[in-house]
């Protein structure tokens, strides 16, 4: 068998999840656990999307400049890439927040959003807040403590204090990862809105709506 055929998924050596996938499930914005579970265990071809990142990139640059003017040491995008290996579950969780800013003992993680506010945005930043101090790549930057979180929208800034990374949030994440790492395969939960952007091709999901 070869994995060069179009749309044929390649099994991952280890379950692998992006923070954004987990955030959507935690926020209840994605109902098809099957799709996320398949992506965690297999590599699928990326679907091309008509997304113009120029507005987002410009806002990141401007925000970073503002923080630097306020005396922060600012780390942007690729400098913030991290991977956290699970201890209880065999999974690697990866992420890349837009900005991590440090001023003395004050550490802030920020994510820039150009669209409308979503519940998953808060979950995404909270996951960054939890995982950044645990990752080898960013542990030192975070000074071994949970950073303050911010979501930067065009018209407002949403503050997420460190105390929100509480026992309940950690339990919810732990329960979700336990579900995703189980050997049980979930049934697809198709909908036009989710299937439109889903990476799972119809060859591997007979219930795709589009």
Spans of features found by a protein language model:
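Short cysteine clusters
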Residues: 32, 189, 195-205
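Secondary-structure transition/capping residues
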Residues: 75, 139-140, 184-187, 209
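Residue-level signal for secondary-structure boundary elements
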Residues: 37, 49, 181-188
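Nucleic-acid nuclease catalytic cores
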Residues: 84-184, 193, 199-202
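Iron-sulfur (Fe-S) cluster-binding segments and ferredoxin-like electron-carrier domains
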Residues: 37-43, 200-210
